[in-house]
Amino acid sequence: GIQFNSANLIEFKTAESNTALYLYDPDTMHAIITGNYVNEQDEEIPDTYGGDELAFLREMDYMSYAYSQIINEAANNAPNTVLTYPDTIIGQQFEITARLIAGGLETPFYRLNQNGYDTHIDQVGSSPSYTGTHTTLLSDLSNSLSVFLMEMDALGLLDKVLVITTSEFGRR
């Protein structure tokens, strides 16, 4: 799966590790990884105490490079949208998700993230009662999700998409 703007989320944890790829946007990810990638796959691993660790790091480096190529290609292959997403963090995440799905990326799960619900004041405005931080956040989510669903429908992909909203709030 792909997770946006937050790492180590519960939905992608296994007993051994986190199985998701963290993504802010495909272009930035691709530029960072390809700009720093050093192809050392064919170089011999030294027979030292750190040899296994070096082999692991090289494999992770290569896999990051390979995945960034695939993600970037999907983002670039997507048709241009005629819809306007809200210019918000969650709106941008929905827009990127739509691009990746439309571009043919076969990732089965996308985990978007909207922060800001941990409020202690101004959660609901005093007058009128439909203002405040909570209302603004839910409105942003609703507007962004609406555009995403309209785009999936326009692309003939709506029957392949299931949207679930969850909330995790707790004190440990």
Regions found by a protein language model. Give the residues of each.
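Metal-dependent active-site segment of extracytoplasmic phospho-/sulfohydrolases and closely related
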Residues: 145, 149-172
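Feature for exported/extracytoplasmic and membrane-associated proteins, marking the mature portion
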Residues: 1-143, 147-154
